[in-house]
């Protein structure tokens, strides 16, 4: 049994409620770091934050906008203002993590009319093959049975 003094000290030690910051780029909730599973449908759900912040190209690479591109633009120099509007590519490890957070629907190539990213869907001047996270070879275009010198002479990606 607690006495009146002990009870009053317990009540007095109550603290003010914690104020939570508004959700921004740095404030990603903990449930977005792992793969979520939908019990009603019986399969995993795509992370909505990934869909909002990143774009998956048809060749498997992920791009995202430059962080802080709209913050205090008037204070930055001209070069920063120009380059901050560019998109950045993710690293191989980041691409693998983002692929695991997505469902197969979002991993399929998408073809939209008047797509501003259509120029970036094909990788140019890359001789190494694209390999997925299991080490399997992923083709970007149909297989053509001819040697590399002939294909470089007569076929271009543009």
Curated annotation (Swiss-Prot):
Major localization class: mitochondrion
Ribosomal protein recorded as keyword: yes
Subcellular location: Mitochondrion
UniProt keyword terms in alphabetical order: Mitochondrion, Ribonucleoprotein, Ribosomal protein, Transit peptide
InterPro entries per record: Ribosomal_bL35m
Record flagged with keyword Phosphoprotein: no
Protein name, entry field: Large ribosomal subunit protein bL35m
Organism: Caenorhabditis elegans
Lineage: Eukaryota, Metazoa, Ecdysozoa, Nematoda, Chromadorea
